[in-house]
Amino acid sequence: MNHTVIQKLQKILGYTFIKKDLLIQALTHRSANSKHNERLEFLGDSILSFVIANALYHCFPHVNEGDMSRMRATLVRGHTLAKIAYEFDLGDYLQLGQGELKSGGFRRESILANTVEALIGSIFLDSNLKTIEKLILKWYKNRLKAINPSDTQKDPKTRLQEYLQSKHLPLPSYLVEQVYGEAHNQLFTIYCEISGINEKTIGIGSSRRKAEQEAAQNALIKLGIE
């Protein structure tokens, strides 16, 4: 990745890295290099959850724990992170292996969402908690303003199930197509099958739950609900 490309992405993110190798690693998928972004993703996931929880606690002093948990889940879920990635054009900067490139990995929601988390982890390591907190709140400014405690925050599987029930259609089936990697570092590929949709929708994630949620989200998109 050349200097011009790095500069362009840093401008989009609103942060200039001291250690450019952390930025490169955050953008590197496991299919491209053994020095990939999954550990950074793990770190970024925890930091994001803390920052959003802290913001909700102070922005909504009269909202109960259950509603705040649902609000946080909506703000940190893969679909929201993928939207942020699209806003940043992150797909243009991903380092992917040939297989992922050919299968359209640069557009895959799970890969994009994981990369946002990895970037959060890398910026934290390159700076400090205060810096990454300020940056996350900047990225989430409009979303934090728009989220409403009175809205029922439901995950994609729940929304899909309720939609199908409202149409008196059979509930979806989630089928494990592939499990890749060691027991402590697995990647799940899951298909969601729904009566009335000819094509299965796919979800890929670091856990079965995450993969099922992505498959359900893609089904909602295919049905034209979202």
Swiss-Prot record:
Pfam families: dsrm (PF00035), Ribonucleas_3_3 (PF14622). SMART domains: DSRM, RIBOc. It is found in: Cytoplasm. InterPro entries: dsRBD_dom (IPR014720), RNase_III (IPR011907), RNase_III_dom (IPR000999), RNase_III_sf (IPR036389). Mg(2+) binds at residues 41, 114, 117. Residues 155-225 form the DRBM domain. GO terms for molecular function: double-stranded RNA binding; metal ion binding; ribonuclease III activity; rRNA binding. Transmembrane segments: none annotated. Its cofactor is Mg(2+). PROSITE patterns: DS_RBD (PS50137), RNASE_3_1 (PS00517), RNASE_3_2 (PS50142). Its EC number is 3.1.26.3. Residues 6-128 form the RNase III domain. It comes from the Bacteria. GO terms for cellular component: cytoplasm. Homodimer. This is Ribonuclease 3. It comes from Buchnera aphidicola subsp. Baizongia pistaciae (strain Bp). The lineage of its organism: Bacteria, Pseudomonadati, Pseudomonadota, Gammaproteobacteria, Enterobacterales.
